[in-house]
């Protein structure tokens, strides 16, 4: 089985790491993922992925990653050897440590204890059914509480170690990719999803799969299908996940075990978490740390369950606040029940039921606290102050958003002060990681503001998505575990505010806004600054997510860019060395090239001109962009661009049609595309303005998270805004322009009408209609007349001698260039030119076109812009075909500028926003 293979592989590769007996106790997938993850919990670019949702969902699994991020090098080195044992055993130790939180430090300290606890946790995990081994040994509540404490401790130590390893590993990132085929049974399971993941061997652990890697996988699955998959409230849904790991030469096929969800809150959350990937759920089990379903499952169970729960919650969260709230109520029940078992742990249980999810989220956060908690974690309340704080934070998250908000600064201070040295280093990393996660939570819970945002930031580093669902849950459950949440509140405050602050109210927004905070996390370095920026950006991101593109589109984009994103995704959420800005240009260039081609053929009038232009006839029409471009050049596209700029070069240039004819081919490649982009100066400006409201841009949650995390708040506001809107709009533009030429033209007319203040709407409408009609007629007439003339000339030339041929050749050039200089068409063109000139003389039309495109761009209607631009270009082309190369050259220059700026920024924006926010931010920042 995969578990055996993984065991063998882990035993072989993880020689330096403690092997945990939990492997035998846990399911194969759990062993595989858990061991591997624990083995190299710190390694994986997916950690950033994990930080987005999986970490949020699976704090423990991603805790190592977060720990890598948050744990200071000292802690990392100290926890280095422990991390495996702590990471797994901490999960398990929470199972054993539940009897006494004093066991937590011991368990954390002793790998053997951790292994035992890991087994206990595994038994508790059985509670999920999938993890029956762990589940059975420990009582549910006990496990939950212990899982919370142990999780915190192990995450703290393991996290430090992981972060340390990851910190070192980041320097020598080795990418390994595997594909994950996910299919959901029932509901939207008919969608087979295939993801390609890159595992980053940041630790240098032989590229072992880590929790973070698993988390990244699960998170990706979640991002793709998790939100679309709806699990019956207390029902279950099975997601089949097949993991094939090719880079290692080992392929893991993990048919996800159907995840039956137990009745009740645990069921529902566990089912969702399980739902994600049962195979991944096994992986996520270490990640989620048991899950709410596990309730009291030991840390491993908590890790798996919480991770599942996280996934379940994020899904519910995305699915609806109500459902998430239902889960919350269930968690509250479990939390209330768990606190009965152990109030400190009980709060952990709350955190476990509801907070426990947060424990996962805060686990790594708490692990930081936990390393001190391990140091002084004899009792969960005082010794486990870090753990308690963690649990309390979870409880606060679950139960006391207010307390979290109140305690957030205190918690942060406490969290930073208690392990002051480690914590600060950890805080630096955790600020980055947690801020990313917090950003996710904020994105999901925009409610998390000021102090809540601060509080959330640290805990968010662990489980942003999970925290997000738990946020409103915690808001709903604030009364539960208030005593401990207060002490834990300081820690929980950072993790909790995202949960608590988010509140159920924003849950629906979280579906859209859930990641809006990600731009918020743009300043991951300082919580306070980030809190302020995130608060500001959170508002923007809320808007951004409100205008978010279709999630399916984003998912497809994410899938396409998954590999690149994987490269981009680092544990720290910082752009890694492996994150190459070059990818941004490449990603952008492809869309740009496609969009250029589309744009070339996109505009109705240029295409019309191209089709009718003898130059187009001369040039293969099959090459629609070149043909359209050459044809349009004959009718300079540059003038439209200039016209868009408000410069009416066309009217002046119409007298130079013959010159333009010669340059048709030089300009062809640029003109149409630039013609469409010609308006793009305004479009670009509009897009930039629209992009300036970068948060309003449509960012997939994951991309938003990356964007927010990697790109500073300023960075997100800077380059990404301009680029993303352009990109997002670019592809649609050609489509609509091609499909809706008339509509685009009408939109052009409408935009002109709307811009009547600058120009009479009637004249402009008539102008547009006349232009289009005349252009089409003239072009057709041109073509016919040119053909006739050519035919006549050819016949005449054939009848005549070489002199006739000479005259024929003389005539042919104009005929061939008749699009610009056709005699009859020239007259018509002159009319159009005059008509256009008369209209253009009203300079407003071109500004109108420009402003209209800008409006359209702001509304993500680049299509309209392109249509308008195409029409404007067509108009300008009618003139421009008659206009000299001056217009063309100027147009080309303008268009080139526009091309680089608008097309790159548009594509840049599209790719940047939806695919590689951080990559593109780097590039765009450089570009910008």
UniProtKB/Swiss-Prot annotation:
Family per record: Belongs to the NKD family.
GO BP: negative regulation of canonical Wnt signaling pathway; negative regulation of Wnt signaling pathway; neuroblast fate specification; positive regulation of canonical Wnt signaling pathway; segment polarity determination; Wnt signaling pathway
Biased composition (Polar residues): 68-80, 120-133, 484-493, 812-822
Compositional bias annotation for Basic residues: 84-101, 307-317, 353-368, 650-663
Location within or outside the cell: Cell membrane; Cytoplasm; Nucleus
Residue(s) carrying Phosphoserine: 320, 327, 329
Region feature Disordered, mapped onto this chain: 68-133, 291-368, 462-543, 578-600, 614-668, 779-825
Domain of life of the source: Eukaryota
Annotated function: Cell autonomous antagonist of the canonical Wnt signaling pathway. May activate a second Wnt signaling pathway that controls planar cell polarity. Required for neuroblast specification.
Organism in which the protein naturally occurs: Drosophila melanogaster
Biased segments, Low complexity type: 525-538, 583-598, 624-649
InterPro entries per record: Nkd-like (IPR040140)
Signal sequence range: none
Main location: membrane
Biased composition (Basic and acidic residues): 802-811
Protein's name according to its UniProt entry: Protein naked cuticle
Domain annotation EF-hand: ranges: 188-224
Region feature Important for binding to zinc, mapped onto this chain: 227-372
Keywords: Cell membrane, Cytoplasm, Developmental protein, Membrane, Metal-binding, Nucleus, Phosphoprotein, Wnt signaling pathway, Zinc
Quaternary context: Interacts with dsh. This interaction may be stabilized by zinc.
Chain segments carrying region Required for nuclear localization and inhibition of Wnt signaling: 543-572
Region Interaction with dsh, annotated ranges: 177-253
